[in-house]
Regions:
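Structured loop/turn residues at beta-strand edges in well-structured enzyme cores
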Residues: 50-53, 112, 128-130
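Metal-dependent phosphodiesterase/nuclease catalytic metal-binding core
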Residues: 120-192
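Generic structural signal for residues in well-ordered beta-strands
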Residues: 5, 114-116, 132
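Short glycine/serine/proline-enriched coil/turn segments at secondary-structure junctions
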Residues: 14-16, 108, 139-141
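Active-site neighborhood of divalent metal-dependent phosphoester bond hydrolases
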Residues: 83-118
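Active-site metal-binding motif and surrounding structural segment of the metallo-beta-lactamase
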Residues: 39-90, 117-120
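Conserved beta-strand hairpin/beta-sheet module of binuclear metal-dependent hydrolase folds
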Residues: 1-48, 86, 146-148, 155
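Alpha-helix N-cap/helix-start and coil->helix boundary motif
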Residues: 42, 65, 95-96, 139-140, ...
């Protein structure tokens, strides 16, 4: 399990020849999570050989054009690469209206389900391996920041070392493997 972060676009307000508008991608064990989707996002994805249909979730911070103008193209292209899985998009309250208007005006054919959710402050995704949380940011209009945080994973446990230290097999071994210190009957504190 590992996280890889790709800066797809680092320019603000207007794209530059070598810098597209705001977007970032996190790849985690083959799944892709897109944070903002400015103009040029498709080009960056193609240059980095990141697959559109692997995008599980998109997070949009706010409704300024430099953060959302790439979204219609990503949504249309995902249909052309035979996407089957639903796509969840978190963002501001008017994001669904923006997506629906683009679908209608551009006559977009979408062959998969798009689930649009308002990114209220707090935990948006919580599974066994990571969380994604939203929090308000100070900006010229309502804006949301996102944190993707990996949960603690059990470390490698060495039973022979535990036995050698006199730690009895059982619940104490489990606590050590999960990263917790344990206190033995003789008062010794064993660190993981």
């Amino acid at each position: 399990m590992n996280f890889e972060v790709f800066a797809l676009g680092t320019s603000g307000m207007m794209p530059l020849p070598n810098r597209f508008l705001t977007s970032a991608m996190v790849r985690r064990d083959g799944d892709l999570f897109l944070f903002d989707c400015g103009e040029g996002t498709q080009i960056s994805l193609k240059m980095l050989n990141l697959k559109w249909k692997k995008i599980n979730t998109i997070f949009i911070s706010h409704m300024h054009a430099d953060h959302v103008t790439g979204l219609p193209g990503i949504l249309m292209l995902s249909s052309q690469v035979d996407r089957d899985d639903p796509l969840t998009i978190y963002g501001p309250p008017r994001l669904k209206e923006y997506i629906d208007a683009n679908r209608r005006i551009l006559d977009m054919y979408i062959n998969y389900e798009i689930i649009v959710k308002v990114a209220h402050p707090g935990i948006l995704i919580d599974n066994d391996e990571f969380t994604v949380s939203a929090f308000p940011l100070a900006h010229t209009k309502p804006c949301t920041g996102f944190v993707m945080e990996e949960k603690l994973r059990p470390g490698e446990f060495h039973p022979e070392l535990a036995s050698g230290l006199g730690i009895p097999m059982g619940p104490l071994w489990g606590k050590l493997q999960k990263g917790f210190s344990v206190t033995l009957d003789d008062g010794r504190v064993i660190q993981p």
